[in-house]
């Protein structure tokens, strides 16, 4: 059994697209991430029942990636919370909550911590306070803590691997980390060493810079995690 | 062009085997390593002219890996030096010299430093003095400095990646490092980050624990070094 779980995002830009999606394409994904932020708020709530019905055999991670954290949707705090609350009624395996951008929503959803992937994305750099941010997020007691950062130099990637390892040794196996871009690719396949629990792999178009395809990720992890 | 060069070892155990070797199997290897230590000293010297003729289109690394450094041949210092001297007459691209095990031979061959892969192998651990050993080896001014060590824990591998990166930044692009065993596999494909110049990949049977096949290594490096 593979140590690092593979999450495959699905990014639908129109309601009609859901029908064309072939669930079997996602059959080897450990988790399907519905990156809902390619739709409007109303479209998300309209699509939700059909999406969760269609993927009822899959573990679903619901993610509303906002513009400030590199995503596509711009919503008020109120609307962000409202969408997450409604999605929770469909009982997804996990929901992503942007800790530093949507603190109030996180506070309002604390009862669902066992479903939460508390996330932080930095598309500019690997911030020097990353360790403190990770500890802060860890202390909230969510299922997972996820960080995605942008390395500027090789050492940034190596530092992230080391930080993830230290966090895992210190606080346990619930961290997910990735360095984005071409430089960061190694971080997407090094979970067996660092303890990073998940890796995000694309079916076709990637949902973040430096992402590797599902097929390639499976091939590489099967070699590294022999 | 691939940043990390792929070295493929060839380990012949009998004189008659050379004829059966298909040179085209090695055509995508950047360097062919003749791991001669699977033969006796006399067999090596007898095979040499045919080997160098057969692989005249390839860059050849000649390696006599002694028992003390994880290899198969046990020879006196005198015999070790005699073999290397004779092999040098065939003008291989590189020769491996075990720095800490065969210091006198290294001293006697200093004129060939531009062909030398100065090597150190530790099959037990990642020694705490690894950085000092690397600096000491670097100071000898050889073409490459190669270390292969055995990690006991995940942090050992991450430390090796960091040390290799630091060495490369400090002293330039002539280090080759690998952590052996299953744990160390990531180090065999992370040259684009650490600066490790070569990786050793097997055609079929691996010549060191944790080695990845040539085909797999090419596939992975083409993804990571995009």
From Swiss-Prot, chains A, B:
Catalysed reactions, as listed in the record: 3-dehydroquinate = 3-dehydroshikimate + H2O
Coiled coil: none
Active site per database record: 121, 146
Pathway note: Metabolic intermediate biosynthesis; chorismate biosynthesis; chorismate from D-erythrose 4-phosphate and phosphoenolpyruvate: step 3/7
Single GO biological process annotation from the record: aromatic amino acid family biosynthetic process
InterPro entries: Aldolase_TIM, DHquinase_I, Type-I_3-dehydroquinase
Sequence positions that bind 3-dehydroquinate: 33-35, 65, 188, 207, 211
Sorted UniProt keywords: Amino-acid biosynthesis, Aromatic amino acid biosynthesis, Lyase, Schiff base
GO MF entries: 3-dehydroquinate dehydratase activity
Family of the protein in this entry: Belongs to the type-I 3-dehydroquinase family.
Subunit and partners: Homodimer.
Listed HAMAP family: AroD (MF_00214)
Name this polypeptide is given: 3-dehydroquinate dehydratase
Taxonomic source organism: Lactococcus lactis subsp. lactis (strain IL1403) (Streptococcus lactis)
């Amino acid at each position: 059994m593979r140590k690092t779980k593979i999450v495959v995002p699905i990014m639908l830009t129109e309601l009609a697209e859901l029908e064309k999606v072939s669930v079997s394409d996602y059959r080897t994904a450990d988790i399907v991430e519905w990156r809902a932020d390619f739709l409007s708020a109303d479209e998300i709530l309209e699509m939700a029942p059909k999406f969760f019905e269609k993927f009822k055999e899959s573990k679903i991670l619901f993610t509303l990636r906002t513009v400030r954290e590199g995503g596509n949707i711009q919503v008020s705090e109120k609307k962000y919370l409202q969408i997450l609350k409604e999605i929770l009624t469909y009982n997804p395996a996990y929901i992503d909550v942007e800790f530093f951008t949507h603190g109030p929503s996180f506070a309002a959803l604390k009862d669902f911590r066992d479903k939460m992937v508390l996330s932080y994305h930095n598309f500019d750099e690997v911030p020097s306070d990353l360790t403190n941010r990770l500890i802060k997020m860890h202390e909230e007691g969510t299922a997972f803590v996820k960080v995605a950062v942008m390395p500027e130099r090789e050492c940034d990637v190596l530092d992230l691997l080391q930080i993830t390892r230290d966090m895992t040794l210190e606080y346990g196996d619930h961290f997910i980390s990735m360095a984005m871009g071409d430089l960061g690719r190694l971080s997407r396949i090094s979970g067996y060493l660092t303890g990073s629990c998940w890796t995000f792999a694309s079916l076709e178009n990637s949902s973040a810079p430096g992402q590797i395809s599902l097929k390639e990720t499976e091939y590489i992890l099967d070699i590294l995690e022999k």
